[in-house]
Curated annotation (Swiss-Prot):
List of residues binding Zn(2+) 2: 141, 176, 380
Protein name: Peptidase T
Residues reported to bind Zn(2+) 1: 78, 141, 198
Species in which this protein is naturally found: Clostridium botulinum (strain Okra / Type B1)
Claim: RNA-binding is one of the keywords in the record: no
UniProt-annotated catalytic positions: 80, 175 (proton acceptor)
Subcellular location: Cytoplasm
Recorded catalytic activity of this chain's protein: Release of the N-terminal residue from a tripeptide
UniProt cross-references to CDD domains, sorted A to Z: M20_peptT
Length: 408
C-alpha cells in the first residue's frame, strides 16, 4: 500500500475548496476538473463503468471475482476541501520518524504544532507524518480517503487471489458545504451498503452523526442621526448582541464534547440599519435537536415582543439527521468493519461523529453508510496532519472489508 502517500501528495496539489457562496454545481470549477482527473485514473487502473457527471460525481465499479452473490459494497470519499482555510498552493512536509517534540511548521511566522495543544500527535511518535507549512490546510480531509480507496482498488486488481464481490467507488463534491449528497444517484451507484472514508485518527469507526440544521437571523434596525435618535433609532448591532448573549454561553463548540450539542455562530454582518447572524445547530438526540431549533426561534420572538415590532426574523433549515437510526437497521455493516480492523491489528474506536459526512444523508436515501477513519487530525486548519502509516492501514482496511464480505 506504499502508493497511497504518492497519490495523496499529488491530489493535494489541486485546490478543490468548495464555496458557501456559490450556487453552481459543483460550487467550484476546480472540483469538476479534479473529478475528471480521478475518472481517468480509475480507468487507467482497470475499473469499469467509470463516469463523471456534470455535477462532478465520480462513480466506478470493480467487478466481482467470485461466483456467489454477496452484497455490493461502496467506498466513498469527497473531493472538496474546507472553505475555512486556504487550500491553494499547499506545501506539505514529511516529518520522518517523528521524535515526539513540537513541530515548527513555519519558522518565519512562528507557527508551531505544539504537543501541549495537540497531544494526540504523540501517539505517532516514531512514524512519518505529513504536515503543512502553516499557511494552508493539508487536505487530508478528504483526499487521504480518495488516495486510500484508489490504492486499495489497484491492490485488489493486482492481487486476484483476494476474493471479493462487486465494489462500487464514489467521489463526491461539496461535502464541506453540506451538499455532497444533493445530486448523488443512489440507484446508479448500485451498492447495497457503503462506507465513507472521512474519519479522523486510525481506528475510528463511526455510525452516529449529529442532527444538523442551520439558522439565519435577519435583524432590521432603523438608523436615525445620533443627535436626535432618542426613542427613534433601533440599532441592529445592539439587537444582534442581545440575540447572541441570550443563547446559552456554554452550549458552543469550544465548550462541548462527546454527545453534547451546541449552537455555533458562524458569522456576523452588522451595522445600525441591519444585521445578519448565521448559526449552525447540532445535537445527537433528535428530541433535543428539535428543542434547540425552537429555542433559537424563541429568542427572536421574545426580542420582537420586547421591541413591540417584528425586527428579528429567524429562518431554520434542516441539513441532515443522525444516521444511527438507519445504520441500526443493518448493524452487520458496522460489525464487519469492526472485525476487519481487528483482523489487521487495528483497535476499533467506536465514537460519534461531532459533525456530518455524506453518509449521514446517504443513509436516509437508502444507502446505509457508516464512516471509517482516513487517518488525519485537526481538519480544516493549518495544524492538520496525517501519519503515513494511518493512510496505509486505511487502504488495507478497505481490502480486508471487501474480503470479509466475500467470505460471509
Amino acid at each position: 500500500m506504499k502508493d497511497v502517500l504518492e497519490r495523496f501528495l499529488g491530489y493535494i496539489k489541486v485546490d478543490t475548496q468548495s464555496s458557501e457562496e456559490s450556487d453552481t454545481v459543483p460550487t467550484t470549477k476546480t472540483q469538476l476538473e479534479f473529478a475528471k482527473k480521478l475518472g481517468e485514473e480509475l480507468k487507467a487502473i482497470g475499473l469499469k463503468d467509470v463516469s463523471v457527471d456534470e455535477s462532478g460525481y465520480v462513480m466506478a465499479t470493480l467487478e466481482s471475482n467470485i461466483d456467489k452473490k454477496v452484497p455490493a459494497i461502496g467506498f466513498i470519499a469527497h473531493m472538496d476541501t474546507s472553505p475555512d482555510l486556504s487550500g491553494t498552493n499547499i506545501n506539505p512536509r514529511i516529518v520522518e520518524k517523528y521524535d515526539g517534540q513540537d513541530i515548527v511548521l513555519n519558522k518565519e511566522k512562528n507557527i508551531v504544532l505544539k504537543i501541549n495543544e495537540f497531544p494526540e500527535i504523540l501517539e505517532y511518535k516514531g512514524q512519518d507524518i505529513v504536515v503543512t507549512d502553516g499557511n494552508t490546510l493539508l487536505g487530508a480531509d478528504d483526499k487521504a480517503g480518495i488516495a486510500e480507496i484508489i490504492t486499495a482498488m489497484e491492490y485488489l486488481i493486482n492481487h486476484p487471489e483476494i476474493k471479493h464481490g462487486t465494489i462500487k467507488v464514489g467521489f463526491t463534491p461539496d461535502e464541506e458545504v453540506g451538499k455532497g449528497a444533493d445530486h448523488f444517484d443512489v440507484k446508479k451507484f448500485g451498492a447495497d451498503l457503503a462506507y465513507t472514508l472521512d474519519g479522523g485518527g486510525i481506528g475510528e469507526l463511526e455510525c452516529e452523526t449529529f442532527n444538523a440544521a442551520k439558522a439565519k437571523v435577519i435583524i432590521e434596525g432603523r438608523n436615525v442621526h445620533p443627535g436626535s435618535a432618542k426613542n427613534k433609532m433601533t440599532n441592529a448591532v445592539l439587537v444582534a448582541n442581545k440575540f447572541i448573549n441570550t443563547l446559552p454561553e456554554n452550549e458552543v463548540p469550544e465548550r462541548t464534547e462527546g454527545y453534547e450539542g451546541f449552537f455555533h455562530l458562524l458569522s456576523v454582518k452588522s451595522e445600525v440599519e441591519t444585521a445578519e447572524l448565521n448559526y449552525i445547530i447540532r445535537d445527537f438526540d433528535r428530541k433535543k435537536f428539535e428543542e434547540r431549533k425552537e429555542q433559537i426561534k424563541e429568542v427572536g420572538k421574545k426580542i420582537n415582543e420586547e421591541y413591540n415590532k417584528e425586527i428579528v426574523c429567524v429562518k431554520v433549515e434542516d441539513q441532515y439527521y443522525n444516521m444511527k437510526e438507519k445504520i441500526d437497521e443493518v448493524k452487520y455493516v458496522v460489525d464487519i468493519a469492526y472485525d476487519a480492523m481487528k483482523a489487521i491489528d487495528i483497535e476499533p474506536i467506536l465514537v460519534p461523529i461531532r459533525g456530518g459526512t455524506d453518509g449521514s444523508r446517504l443513509s436516509f436515501m437508502g444507502l446505509p453508510t457508516p464512516n471509517l477513519f482516513a487517518g488525519g487530525h485537526n481538519f480544516h486548519g493549518r495544524f492538520e496532519f496525517v501519519p503515513v502509516l494511518s493512510m496505509e492501514k486505511a487502504a488495507e482496511l478497505v481490502v480486508k472489508i471487501a474480503e470479509l464480505y466475500a467470505n460471509r
